[in-house]
A protein has these predicted regions:
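Solvent-exposed soluble domains appended to multi-pass membrane proteins
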Residues: 1-143
């Protein structure tokens, strides 16, 4: 769970875990920013049930969290169960544009990291990864 590491400087020992007690989240970046008057929002293309995020996100300061299927484009990815990142970028952008005052938006990407499924690529906006230039580096090409 990257958000634990990046926002709270914590490490999960397993992906099958219970996170309580929740006092360890008091030093998470979103909690500290809320105390400074920031409006906090979080976005993730998967279900809130994935890793039970619906239970512990509020404790780390991510009370206003948006999960699948509550987006304007809920077309499923091929690589992961949920909305592809390119399908929710408009929701994230709209939240940023409509922010009043200080705002912090945390977007946990779903499918723009390894492994990449060619079925989730945008076609015209990607390179021809079969060119000799990318020989043996097709995954890197699709980044």
């Amino acid at each position: 769970m990257g958000e634990l590491r990046e926002l709270c400087d914590l490490k999960a020992k397993s992906s099958n875990f219970k996170l309580g007690p929740f006092d360890k989240f008091k030093k998470c970046v979103p909690v500290r920013l809320q105390k400074q008057g920031y409006d906090i929002q979080a976005f993730h293309g998967s279900s809130s049930k994935m890793y039970n995020r619906k239970e512990w996100y509020p404790y780390m300061g991510l009370q206003d969290a948006h999960f699948y299927p509550h987006f304007s484009n809920i077309k499923l990815c091929y690589s992961f169960p949920g909305a592809c990142d390119y399908n929710i970028v408009h929701d994230v952008s709209a939240a940023n544009k409509s922010a009043q005052g200080k705002s912090f938006i945390y977007w946990l990407t779903l499918n723009t990291h390894h492994p990449y499924s060619e079925l989730d690529m945008l076609g015209a906006n990607t390179y021809d990864c079969h060119q000799p230039l990318f020989n043996g580096r097709q995954e890197a090409c699709r980044i």
